[in-house]
């Protein structure tokens, strides 16, 4: 055996040369971000006027003959592109933003897509049908209750009575900004309807191609439902058809904890599997000519049909565009069919169609992963490959059998030859399949790690290892599901259903086992600077080892060390100052429940709840994830006794003393004349009904209405506070009340 080392080729061209469309993509991205940041200050016409001024400046510089006119024209044209992108973004923003009536009204709508199916309600995307121009064809998200939701499908007309909210009500600290999420996804508002507040209409429906494909997807899911149930059905529908409405929170959490959520979102992985099957079965058997061209056109038509069938998610649109460019390039016998420039072109097209696509997490993860996969392959993996295998001359000379006994021939020639061939093919598989698989997985994980930590605060160290299980399973499931749908015979579907069921069970059990490993899932809350360092420090170190000039190597090494030192300093400063919790009182937003939190420090705090310990733990789960964990707040001590004394908190029935402040928890009608001035009055269910008289006889600085009050009690106390000129905070309307103590 001889291994022939391959010489290391020089560094490829810079990113700017490999990606010439980057000069258009970056101004477009910058304009969208600036427009969103300044959406309340700069309107569309101001962006257009600025774009016109910069365009005229660029033209003037091009016509002129001075030395610096080239730079002037380039800068002016870049600024003009930024302003044009800003104007287009504001145009899109104005189309989405809608000021809905403040009262409940009856609306007509058509279901576009079923977003999520839960036991309590079903969430759909609906298009409003109205005679008023400002409301017609606006897309909103509606949550519907009742058994009738089982009859909903794409294209169904519904009538519902609700108040549509364009802005979400403030919630608890660290809560998800739901209104911004809806706006960035082209949705003008949200509504919630109880069972008696909506109904399905039997009027004829007019559906577009998108709705028809979604209706077809629902039929295919129903076909799955004849053989699969519960978790198997939800996973199969998500992995093969992009329908994630049936996925449970537990299943999504399992894939998130193991770092394999990408397999649930249809993307380049799934399209790559389908195209590889098509190439293997058909395209590779056809020479370049009209037959190959016809097969390519059929492949592209099937590809885009699959995109529409899956609901056209952004990750799938990106993959479909890139694979379309790749197939066309291969038909034209172009060598570099999969390039960074194709990635930039796909991003440009999607951002021109809808600029707010930029803020979609799936869009960011998809493009970042592909960018790092291609870049790492060009700069690192293709330049430092394992050596080739070269056969020894001995193995080309096989002696004649008649000179040896069968036993001797088998021992000295046949058996060594088998061992040699096994070793040779194993090495080729290791070099051509296993190593590229690991490299792609590590590149994607490195590129998407900062975004995942920023949005989800989750680190899955074994994600690259879990891909060895997930990706082969996805290949089997897609292939079997394709045959399952194309061969509608009972005996074939039963056999394929068994294969799919076994694969799904092995997949879920394997991921469950990985999720139980030590350090399988870590919650990380890092500063933005540290997240950026995850990208740039490895890049600087890579060029440090590649460059040969001493000064360049010193500059790269110093830059890497400086970034690491600044990152450590930023994390230390954030932990000691920004995330250090000072004494405060928090009255959280929770319906039908009182949740009052007395915080002394990050390590010491006390919680008063009006419900049981199990119910309190359930209601506090999102607050712990969004507020406690990012700020390193320990679990609070639950106050269970009416008479209690702690180092910084004393309780006597409804009276609390915390940091020399008097706090009254009013859930019983009793007199407080002997207590004196009240710094904070928390009104709960069971409080006295004569609110005005009660407030007039006491000295109260601040009133807080917690979530346990009924709407009638809330109105009574709000009116009483206005009459007595006492500040009043309603947690259900204004969000959690936070009082930072001196």
For each feature predicted by the language model, list its residue ranges:
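N-terminal leader/targeting segments
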Residues: 1-102, 318, 336
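Membrane-helix interface and helix-disruption motif detector
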Residues: 37-46, 361, 465, 522-526
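Hydrophobic alpha-helical segments of integral membrane proteins
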Residues: 209-227, 235, 243, 251, ...
């Amino acid at each position: 055996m001889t291994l022939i080392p391959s010489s290391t080729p020089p560094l490829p061209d810079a990113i700017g040369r490999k990606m010439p469309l980057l000069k258009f993509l970056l101004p477009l991205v910058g304009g969208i971000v600036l427009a969103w940041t300044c959406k309340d200050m700069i309107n569309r016409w101001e962006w257009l006027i600025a774009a016109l001024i910069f365009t005229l400046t660029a033209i003037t510089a091009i016509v002129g003959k001075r030395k610096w006119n080239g730079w002037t024209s380039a800068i002016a044209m870049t600024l003009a592109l930024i302003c044009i992108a800003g104007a287009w973004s504001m145009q899109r923003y104005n189309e989405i933003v809608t000021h809905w009536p403040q009262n409940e009204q009856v609306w007509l709508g058509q279901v576009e897509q079923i977003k999520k199916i839960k036991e309590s309600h079903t969430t759909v995307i609906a298009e409003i049908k109205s005679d008023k121009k400002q409301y017609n064809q606006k897309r909103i998200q509606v949550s519907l209750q009742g058994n009738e939701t089982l009859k909903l499908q794409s294209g169904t007309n519904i009538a519902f009575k609700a108040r549509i909210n364009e802005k979400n009500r403030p919630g608890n600290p660290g809560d998800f900004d739901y209104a911004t999420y809806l706006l960035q996804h082209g949705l003008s508002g949200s509504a919630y309807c109880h069972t008696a507040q909506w109904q399905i209409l039997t009027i004829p429906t007019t559906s577009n191609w998108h709705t028809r494909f979604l209706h077809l997807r629902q039929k295919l899911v129903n076909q799955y439902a004849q053989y699969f149930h519960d978790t198997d059905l939800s996973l199969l529908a998500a992995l093969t058809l992009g329908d994630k409405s049936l996925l449970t929170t537990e299943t999504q959490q399992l894939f998130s904890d193991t770092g394999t959520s990408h397999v649930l979102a249809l993307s380049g992985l799934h399209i790559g599997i389908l195209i590889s099957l098509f190439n293997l079965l058909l395209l590779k058997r056809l020479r370049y000519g009209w037959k190959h061209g016809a097969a390519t056109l059929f492949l592209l038509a099937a590809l885009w049909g699959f995109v529409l069938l899956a609901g056209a998610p952004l990750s799938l649109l990106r993959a479909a565009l890139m694979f379309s460019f790749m197939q066309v390039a291969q038909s034209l016998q172009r060598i570099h069919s999969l390039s960074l420039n194709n990635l930039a072109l796909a991003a440009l097209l999607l951002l021109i169609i809808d600029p707010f696509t930029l803020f979609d997490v799936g869009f960011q993860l998809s493009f970042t992963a592909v960018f790092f996969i291609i870049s790492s392959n060009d700069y690192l993996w293709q330049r430092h490959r394992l050596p080739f295998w070269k056969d020894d001359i001995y193995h080309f000379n096989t002696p004649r059998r008649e000179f040896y006994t069968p036993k001797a021939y088998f021992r000295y020639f046949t058996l060594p030859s088998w061992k040699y061939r096994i070793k040779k093919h194993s090495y080729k598989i290791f070099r051509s399949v296993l190593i590229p698989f690991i490299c792609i997985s590590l590149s994607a994980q490195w590129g998407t790690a900062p975004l995942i930590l920023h949005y989800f605060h989750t680190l899955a160290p074994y994600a690259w290892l879990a891909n060895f299980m997930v990706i082969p399973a996805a290949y089997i499931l897609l292939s079997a599901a394709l045959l399952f749908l194309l061969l509608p015979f009972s005996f074939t579907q039963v056999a394929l259903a068994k294969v799919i069921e076994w694969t799904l069970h092995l997949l879920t059990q394997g991921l469950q086992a990985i999720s139980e490993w030590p350090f399988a899932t870590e919650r990380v809350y890092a500063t933005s600077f540290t997240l950026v360092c995850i990208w740039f420090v490895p890049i600087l170190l890579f060029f440090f080892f590649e460059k040969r000039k001493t000064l360049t190597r010193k500059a790269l090494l110093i830059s890497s060390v400086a970034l690491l030192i600044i990152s450590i300093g930023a994390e230390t400063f954030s932990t000691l100052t920004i995330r250090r919790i000072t004494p405060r009182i928090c009255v959280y937003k929770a319906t039908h429940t009182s949740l009052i939190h007395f915080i002394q420090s990050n390590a010491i705090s006390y919680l008063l709840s009006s419900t049981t310990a199990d119910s309190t733990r359930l209601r506090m789960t999102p607050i712990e994830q969004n507020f406690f964990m990012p700020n390193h707040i320990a679990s609070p001590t639950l106050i269970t006794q009416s008479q209690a004394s702690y180092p910084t908190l004393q309780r006597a029935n409804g009276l609390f003393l915390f940091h020399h402040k008097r706090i009254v928890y009013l859930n019983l009608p009793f007199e407080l004349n002997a207590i004196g001035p009240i710094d904070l009055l928390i009104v709960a269910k069971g409080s006295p009904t004569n609110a005005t008289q009660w407030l007039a006889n006491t000295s109260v600085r601040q009133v807080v209405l917690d979530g346990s009050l009924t709407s009638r009690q809330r109105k009574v106390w709000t009116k009483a506070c206005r009459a007595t000129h006492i500040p009043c905070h309603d947690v259900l309307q204004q969000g959690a009340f936070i009082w930072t103590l001196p």
